[in-house]
């Protein structure tokens, strides 16, 4: 039974899931808006919003924590210096999910996830 299970497995092993979320979050930070499946977008939302909250502290420990999660110097720099300062006054809700279409190959619902 799946009762009260805390996250989506997305049909992947734990390491594959971690790599997927890391790569999706780097793409979202670099481009501001990406298209993915609704399930991945919902899981990515919680991952990215936690990173933005940590990056908003804007000290060296925040920088280290974000880099530990992303492993990308460019994305870390952009998140800490450009994106997070815009959301300092905001208490969560940094992303928006918009359902777009049904994918032709497997009829999966697709969605845009973007930074507000």
Swiss-Prot record:
<protein>
    <recommendedName>
        <fullName>Large ribosomal subunit protein bL17</fullName>
    </recommendedName>
</protein>
<dbReference type="GO" id="GO:0022625">
    <property type="term" value="C:cytosolic large ribosomal subunit"/>
</dbReference>
<dbReference type="Pfam" id="PF01196">
    <property type="entry name" value="Ribosomal_L17"/>
</dbReference>
<dbReference type="InterPro" id="IPR036373">
    <property type="entry name" value="Ribosomal_bL17_sf"/>
</dbReference>
<comment type="similarity">
    <text>Belongs to the bacterial ribosomal protein bL17 family.</text>
</comment>
<dbReference type="GO" id="GO:0003735">
    <property type="term" value="F:structural constituent of ribosome"/>
</dbReference>
<keyword id="KW-0689">Ribosomal protein</keyword>
<keyword id="KW-0687">Ribonucleoprotein</keyword>
<dbReference type="GO" id="GO:0006412">
    <property type="term" value="P:translation"/>
</dbReference>
<dbReference type="InterPro" id="IPR000456">
    <property type="entry name" value="Ribosomal_bL17"/>
</dbReference>
<comment type="subunit">
    <text>Part of the 50S ribosomal subunit. Contacts protein L32.</text>
</comment>
